[in-house]
Amino acid sequence: MKILAIESSCDEFSISIIDNNKILTNIISSQIKDHQVFGGVVPELAARLHVQNFNWVLKAALSQSNLNIEEIDYIAYTKSPGLIGSLIIGKLVAETISLYINKPILALDHIQGHIFGASIENEFIYPVLAMVVSGGHTQIEIINSANDFQIIGSTRDDAIGECYDKVARVLGLSYPGGPILDKLALKGNKDFYSLPVLKDDNTYDFSYSGLKTACINLIHNLNQKKQEINLENFAASFQYTATNIIEKKLEKAIKEFKPKTLTVAGGVSANSEIRKIILKLGQKYNIKNTFVPKMSYCTDNAAMIAKLAYEKILLKNKL
């Protein structure tokens, strides 16, 4: 069973081909350099660049897999969430291929894809407790199968990735700022700057707007007083505050839902502190099937969509 998957929800256009649960190729066309000058992703530019890039990405994926397009059995693509223009390009490419080779097409969820991207090299044992962290999402999910996802907590305002990027921008760091803050934090003192501790209420929801505002106000106040900001210490203080609440909420979820697998997914799953938290909690609560995704599967890629499609088709064929 060969599946060709397309991921185009933001500023990456990616095509992956999977053959019976083995990833044959995962080609990614990244636009980071094109958007850096603007300090963030420009939706119209992202969609136009997808149009320019999809042809060579498709050719490269087929060439690397040593396959002809007619040998593909299923087409899968990201339907949502994401930038509308970018999603439409991926959908059009997927539908065109599907019509051309007369093969079934699957429209899949981007976040569910991220979750199953974590299982590419480590198979899930259900139930799965997944921490989803990205530019647009901060949520905890319980997964019982490729068709059974339960969101038990989500962001009420800003997502953690958005908070990272906005704080980095105010500090004068380049885009994307999250990875830069993470690297700086490794060398800093988390107790150097005083930031408000995020509230741990009785829910599994998250809120990062208060932390974002507090950071921006502190930076502006220090600048007005002409006090030098130690970037490493600021990053460490910010990162500790941003991730500490994740550890608390996850620990509570582990006690309540008793998962057999613990993992993390989404672009911010590349964050060093969050990865440490996942592994630490897995060890503390003896969840033997605890793992973090390979770094190349953290950011947007089509391999995660291919894996989700494979698991959904497998489940359907068993029924």
Curated annotation (Swiss-Prot):
Its EC number is 2.3.1.234. Substrate binds at V132, V133, S134, G135, G136, D165, G178, D182, N271. One of its GO terms (biological process) is tRNA threonylcarbamoyladenosine modification. Fe cation binds at H110, H114, D300. Coiled coil: none annotated. Keywords: Acyltransferase, Cytoplasm, Iron, Metal-binding, Transferase, tRNA processing. It is an enzyme of class 2 (transferase). Binds 1 Fe(2+) ion per subunit. GO terms for molecular function: iron ion binding; N(6)-L-threonylcarbamoyladenine synthase activity. It catalyses: L-threonylcarbamoyladenylate + adenosine(37) in tRNA = N(6)-L-threonylcarbamoyladenosine(37) in tRNA + AMP + H(+). InterPro entries: ATPase_NBD, Gcp-like_dom, KAE1/TsaD, TsaD. It holds the Pfam family TsaD. PANTHER family: TRNA N6-ADENOSINE THREONYLCARBAMOYLTRANSFERASE, TRNA N6-ADENOSINE THREONYLCARBAMOYLTRANSFERASE, MITOCHONDRIAL. Required for the formation of a threonylcarbamoyl group on adenosine at position 37 (t(6)A37) in tRNAs that read codons beginning with adenine. Is involved in the transfer of the threonylcarbamoyl moiety of threonylcarbamoyl-AMP (TC-AMP) to the N6 group of A37, together with TsaE and TsaB. TsaD likely plays a direct catalytic role in this reaction. This is tRNA N6-adenosine threonylcarbamoyltransferase.
